[in-house]
Amino acid sequence: MNRKGRRKTEKVYVKVNSDFDATGYMQPRQITWGDGRTYPIEQVRDFRPANTIADMPGDCYTVMIKGQERYLFFERSDPRFPSRFGRWFVEVETK
């Protein structure tokens, strides 16, 4: 644990297939890890600014994967690079 009492984690960037609805809402559908493992997202249970969960800018989706609740983060890109909208990551516990 770190000084704030939180478990030590690191960002692991993942590929996420998403849909956008007519209002512009981004709905993540599937996660693919770097080694090729793919997991469908069964349900999006919540969506909020990430700083309500962790001290970071961006968005946090609470999703169900294989019956377990997980956090999936969307990190917005620097506005100086308009062709890059952002990227997805999960937090993985470290020792």
List each language-model region with its residue ranges:
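Cysteine-centric segments in proteins
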Residues: 1-95
